[in-house]
């Protein structure tokens, strides 16, 4: 997938990293919000072809028109044919752009599915499937941030949900739980990603964090066994908090624990979220946090609701 759509979002979020949020006035927040919203819609509803939606190659040529008169294109790399809406949010969609915008903002506001369906003017079933389509696109759009300086690393757990699976309500951390690997640095940048059922393995953690944590950083975590191989692979300083302790040499896991609270608060109003869709919900959580942080709930309601 093309990466050009992420540039404006990255530039805008860097502003949030370099200044204190309280120092922004209302006009600055609205301008920053408009920039990020415009970048999102540029990706979601873009009709200008810059690369192949299948392989990302920029070597594309026009290849006639389809039966509806829409321009077709051919990729010289993978030889596949496509139109300007292929693999985009509007592909095979029965919703108008205005309806997608309402669904987008309602999802960012973490509205219940019934409220979203009422606002968009569709059934609850349609709202469900289109919200998942939106979350899939957001997960493809979002970039992993590079974490640096002091980084708190820990995992939290949600109940595992799958079709035909009966929860046994076992005590402790078992296969009835799905792990979410979380890492957050002192600047507030964070990475959240679904891991394994039960405790995450070292190979899973390496896959998630190997290109995320910058060299020279300090990682703070508990003494879980799977972290040992991760730290060996990253080759960085590791502050290991002993089991039963809350801190070591002034280092704590307070930052990542607060992130866990925010994740669980986001899922609190959502019952029986299927694990298959969990990563999409985590992408929606990150966009929702950015949206709420910039313009606040009252400003959101005044402008959009």
PLM features per residue range, with description:
Residues 1-305:
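Residue-level recognition of single "structural anchor" positions
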């Amino acid at each position: 997938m093309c990466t050009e759509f992420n540039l404006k979002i990255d530039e805008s979020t860097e502003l949030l990293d370099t200044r204190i949020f309280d120092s922004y006035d209302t006009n600055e927040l609205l301008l920053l919000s408009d920039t990020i919203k415009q970048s999102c819609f540029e990706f979601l509803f873009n009709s200008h072809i810059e690369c192949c939606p299948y392989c990302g190659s920029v070597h594309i040529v026009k290849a006639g028109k389809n039966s509806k008169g829409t321009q077709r294109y051919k990729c010289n790399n993978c030889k596949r044919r496509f139109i300007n809406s292929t693999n985009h949010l509007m592909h095979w969609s029965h919703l108008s752009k205005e309806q997608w915008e309402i669904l987008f903002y309602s999802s960012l506001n973490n509205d219940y599915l019934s409220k979203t369906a009422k606002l968009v003017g569709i059934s609850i079933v349609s709202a469900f499937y289109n919200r998942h389509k939106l979350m899939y696109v957001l997960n493809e759009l979002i970039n992993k941030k590079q974490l640096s300086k002091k980084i708190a690393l820990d995992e939290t757990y949600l109940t595992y949900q799958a079709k035909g699976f009966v929860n046994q309500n076992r005590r402790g951390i078992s296969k009835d739980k799905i792990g979410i690997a979380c890492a957050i640095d002192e600047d507030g940048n964070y990475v959240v990603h679904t891991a394994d059922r039960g405790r995450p393995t070292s190979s899973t953690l390496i896959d998630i964090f190997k290109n995320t944590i910058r060299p020279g950083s300090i990682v703070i975590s508990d003494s879980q066994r799977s972290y040992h191989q991760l730290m060996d692979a990253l080759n960085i300083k590791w502050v290991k908090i002993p089991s039963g302790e809350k801190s070591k040499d002034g280092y704590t896991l307070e930052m990542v624990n607060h992130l866990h609270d925010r994740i669980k608060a986001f899922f609190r109003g959502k019952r029986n979220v299927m694990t298959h869709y969990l990563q999409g919900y985590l992408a929606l959580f990150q966009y929702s946090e950015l949206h709420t942080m910039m313009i606040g709930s009252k400003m959101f309601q005044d402008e959009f609701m």
